[in-house]
Amino acid sequence: MNFRQLLLHLPRYLGASGSPRRLWWSPSLDTISSVGSWRGRSSKSPAHWNQVVSEAEKIVGYPTSFMSLRCLLSDELSNIAMQVRKLVGTQHPLLTTARGLVHDSWNSLQLRGLVVLLISKAAGPSSVNTSCQNYDMVSGIYSCQRSLAEITELIHIALLVHRGIVNLNELQSSDGPLKDMQFGNKIAILSGDFLLANACNGLALLQNTKVVELLASALMDLVQGVYHENSTSKESYITDDIGISTWKEQTFLSHGALLAKSCQAAMELAKHDAEVQNMAFQYGKHMAMSHKINSDVQPFIKEKTSDSMTFNLNSAPVVLHQEFLGRDLWIKQIGEAQEKGRLDYAKLRERIKAGKGVTSAIDLCRYHGNKALEALESFPPSEARSALENIVFAVTRFS
């Protein structure tokens, strides 16, 4: 059974998706000025999101869900997949990550590669530099740009796999045997490293030192961002004094840098000038920020939310809530939500919803959405540009 086949069979085996107590990563956010008017117009539902992605995939030529398939079907990763099967029945998060590679609609693990392809097509060939005219072009996209999209996905998936490494010091008896978690961690490290190695090999084959530099710096940003997210101890992480400006800086590193620099690299491969490269970078940056904030807001706006559902205490709505409330009152609210050493997320969620944090996070999401749309105005009207706009509309509408 190869890796792709294993992924397709995993949902059959996995009932509950319970994950261990705490992973070795988690995020954080500072104040918003005026947000400005919003230009979005589409409904943000899973069905609509899937439609937006499906239409975009038709524009770029093939489903992005198969972009990294060449790597995932390699003999080396097939051997790893056989080891992953041994984790079925455990609660190691690597299984959840693997399942998400096939069945992930809203987060769309292939979103980054899709955006790289769309912005490549939206920009088209350089009108000034004709040195790329001998490159293969399919559906308005150079072959090297398609390779870049695959590389972007490989890096993203590798980091997701590595983020699934469990902090063994924080395991509880309900998380299952220690040996299962140790084995799962070894497989997560091995498979993540393998994907990163393939991405590095693909970058070398592009034979463009600036693109290599951009993607290498994006990888450095990712690692630095995750380090900041995980820089506090278990005892103090729920009371971190993080402002929204700091949160935005850290979130760009961990969630926006890869897409922003990949979009810029796609323009470099087509020999576009610095201005076009910067606009592509700005779109990738602000779209990624909108997508992240939207995900942060979901636990607070879903109509049906389980009382046991947790949320990230360093997410955008929570950090903004703390800013508006003040440090002392925030710590008091956390203390009041503690019951027998456990945090009552349902009670804390209601306190946060009663404040300004959620609405301010929605405003911040739309602010970044507007910035992404402004960047697209530098590109000529086209189907690809419309698809990029629709992606922004989909991640910035909350009705």
Swiss-Prot record:
Pathway: Cofactor biosynthesis; ubiquinone biosynthesis. One of its GO terms (molecular function) is all-trans-decaprenyl-diphosphate synthase activity. It is found in: Mitochondrion. Its EC number is 2.5.1.91. It catalyses: 7 isopentenyl diphosphate + (2E,6E)-farnesyl diphosphate = all-trans-decaprenyl diphosphate + 7 diphosphate; 6 isopentenyl diphosphate + (2E,6E)-farnesyl diphosphate = all-trans-nonaprenyl diphosphate + 6 diphosphate. The keyword Glycoprotein does not apply. Transmembrane segments: none annotated. One of its GO terms (cellular component) is polyprenyl diphosphate synthase complex. GO terms for biological process: cerebellum development; isoprenoid biosynthetic process; regulation of body fluid levels; ubiquinone biosynthetic process. It is an enzyme of class 2 (transferase). Keywords: Disease variant, Isoprene biosynthesis, Lipid metabolism, Mitochondrion, Primary mitochondrial disease, Transferase, Ubiquinone biosynthesis. Pfam families: polyprenyl_synt. It is linked to Coenzyme Q10 deficiency, primary, 3: A fatal encephalomyopathic form of coenzyme Q10 deficiency with nephrotic syndrome. Coenzyme Q10 deficiency is an autosomal recessive disorder with variable manifestations consistent with 5 major phenotypes. The phenotypes include an encephalomyopathic form with seizures and ataxia; a multisystem infantile form with encephalopathy, cardiomyopathy and renal failure; a predominantly cerebellar form with ataxia and cerebellar atrophy; Leigh syndrome with growth retardation; and an isolated myopathic form. Heterotetramer composed of 2 PDSS1/DPS1 and 2 PDSS2/DLP1 subunits. Heterotetrameric enzyme that catalyzes the condensation of farnesyl diphosphate (FPP), which acts as a primer, and isopentenyl diphosphate (IPP) to produce prenyl diphosphates of varying chain lengths and participates in the determination of the side chain of ubiquinone. Supplies nona and decaprenyl diphosphate, the precursors for the side chain of the isoprenoid quinones ubiquinone-9 (Q9) and ubiquinone-10 (Q10) respectively. The enzyme adds isopentenyl diphosphate molecules sequentially to farnesyl diphosphate with trans stereochemistry. May play a role during cerebellar development. Belongs to the FPP/GGPP synthase family. This is All trans-polyprenyl-diphosphate synthase PDSS2. The gene is PDSS2.
